[in-house]
Design a protein with these regions (language model features):
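Short, solvent-exposed loop/beta-turn-alpha elements that line the ligand-binding surface or hinge
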Residues: 115-130, 175-177, 201, 226-247, ...
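Hinge/lid segment of periplasmic solute-binding proteins
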Residues: 99-156, 199, 296-301, 373, ...
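Extracytoplasmic/periplasmic solute-binding protein
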Residues: 139-151, 156, 166, 181-236, ...
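Mature extracytoplasmic/periplasmic domains
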Residues: 267, 317-402
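C-terminal capping/gating helix-and-loop segments adjacent to ligand/active sites or protein-protein/ligand interfaces
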Residues: 141, 150, 375-436
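Extracytoplasmic "Venus flytrap"/periplasmic binding protein-like
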Residues: 57, 61-131, 166-169, 270, ...
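Glycine-centered hinge/linker elements that transmit conformational signals in sensory
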Residues: 187, 233-263, 300
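Extracytoplasmic/periplasmic substrate-recognition and gating elements
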Residues: 60, 65-68, 168, 257, ...
Length: 442
């Protein structure tokens, strides 16, 4: 999902040529001092700042032992960086893990099984959000081991620009009444009052009620799950009745044909060009806070075709299989500290939103609650609705994961381009793309 196809294909194809050799054979990790471990993260400023906060707290806690953390930047795409560092024997002791590629790299033996450490230290996994624990069980089939520890709880939510609603004279709904039908009603009301919104904000010349990206995996997975359609299942791109498949496609398409949204347009909720925006927690909140948007957050709409599923995901850290024996204990202490209540609180000082520990979600004075000015209930409400975004986890061969993800992305981008991108009906559109995806699945 995050990776450019050209880069990802290079990395994955290269891995295919060595998969039979056993990926854990080479390695040995990056050379450091006896009490220093390396932690590899994506090479961007926000991740570096996040890790620095956690590193400083960890080093302070273990000052007597002299434990240190050296930050290693993963340059280029994640897949390319992991492959390149592994082949060079330069994998860090601990590495950042992303939900959408975790199954692939787990299958290649890059991440160490953490169950032994969890059992030894009597870590109670019931203290954490169930879906976050499930998503870190990134093995395939009956393998239910934890190969990494989730850092923060992320799911689809709905952001509301309150200034837009006020200008339009539309009341912001409550979380309890925020159903799919209510969302459509609100979008129509915002559309009907477009002139009021434009008149109230002289800095914009275009307005749409909402943004909703159907080509983003959490969105299309959520929509089809609510229509009782499984993706990439039983040899089918869409495993469900044609009636439900077409109904879901038509519902997503209607958001554009009714004028509720502009797909791919350069419009932004932070400027007031949008009234609503469907997005994740991790990247959304820091953006709205940075731009000082007068916003509110609602859950993802419920009661879509009678169901209320919503995709969730996570970023975390895992110990690499290349971590040397003399560093494993320090690496585990770092991971378990990040996962502890103390570590979650310290990490929240980076401005990260929504920890994975249940007790901190509703704790009024929890550190993470200091970094947004809104009612944060939507970030963790209704955990029973959660579905893992990693819908390809058990699909084999894992080498096909990236190309399959990409084909779903291209499909849903084309749904909003020139009305099925030259295909005359939803049925013809579906027939073309389902065959294309299923060809990738063979």
């Amino acid at each position: 999902m995050k990776n450019i196809k050209k880069i990802a294909t290079f990395a994955l194809c290269a891995l295919m040529t060595i998969s039979g050799l056993g990926l854990t054979a080479c390695g040995g990790g990056t050379k450091t001092g006896e009490t220093e471990i390396t932690v590899g993260i994506l090479n961007n400023s926000s991740e570096r700042e996040n890790l620095k906060v956690l590193r400083n707290a960890f080093e302070k806690k273990y000052e007597a032992e002299g434990y240190k953390v050296k930050i290693v930047n993963l340059t280029g795409s994640y897949n390319e960086a992991v492959y390149r560092m592994h082949m060079a024997g330069q994998l860090p002791d601990v590495i950042q893990v992303f939900d959408d590629t975790s199954a692939y790299w787990t299958s290649k033996g890059i991440y160490a099984d953490l169950d032994e450490y969890i059992a030894r230290d009597n870590i109670d996994l019931s203290l954490y959000v169930d879906s976050m624990i499930d998503i870190a069980r990134s093995g395939q089939g009956n393998d239910d081991s934890l190969y990494w520890l989730p850092r923060d709880y992320d799911k689809l939510v709905t952001y509301v620009n309150k200034d837009v609603f006020q200008a339009a004279g539309v009341e912001v709904p409550t979380a309890e009444e925020w159903t799919w039908a209510k969302m459509l009603e609100v979008c129509q009301a915002l559309k009907d009052n477009e002139k009021k919104v434009l008149a109230a904000n002289q800095e914009i010349n275009v307005f749409y009620p909402m943004s909703f990206d159907p080509s983003w995996a959490p969105v299309y997975l959520t929509m089809f799950k609510n229509y009782n359609v499984e993706l990439a299942s039983n040899g089918k791109a869409f495993d469900g009745t044609e009636e439900n498949i077409y109904a879901c496609l038509n519902e997503m398409l209607s958001l554009q044909t009714k004028g509720y949204m502009s797909f791919g347009g350069n419009v932004n909720i932070t400027t007031g060009e949008l009234g609503l925006a469907v997005g994740g927690v991790r990247t959304g909140v820091p953006t709205y806070e940075m731009y000082d948007v007068n916003y509110e957050v609602l859950p993802f709409p419920s009661q879509i075709n009678g169901n209320s599923y919503v995709a969730c995901g996570a970023v975390g850290y895992g110990m690499t299989s290349s971590c040397s024996e003399d560093k494993k204990e320090i690496a585990w202490k770092f991971l378990s500290y990040m996962f502890s209540e103390e570590g979650q609180e310290e990490f929240s000082k980076s401005g990260a939103i929504c920890p994975v520990m249940k007790s901190l979600l509703e704790k009024e004075d929890a550190e993470w609650k200091k970094y947004s000015k809104v009612d944060d209930t939507a970030f963790y409400a209704y955990p029973e609705r959660d579905i893992k975004v990693t819908f390809l986890q058990d699909f084999q061969p894992v080498e096909q994961h990236t190309s399959i993800y990409n084909n779903y992305t291209y499909m849903f981008k084309d749904l909003y381009k020139d009305k099925y991108n030259g295909r005359q009906t939803v049925e013809a559109f579906y027939s073309h793309y389902s065959k294309q995806i299923e060809q990738e699945m063979k």
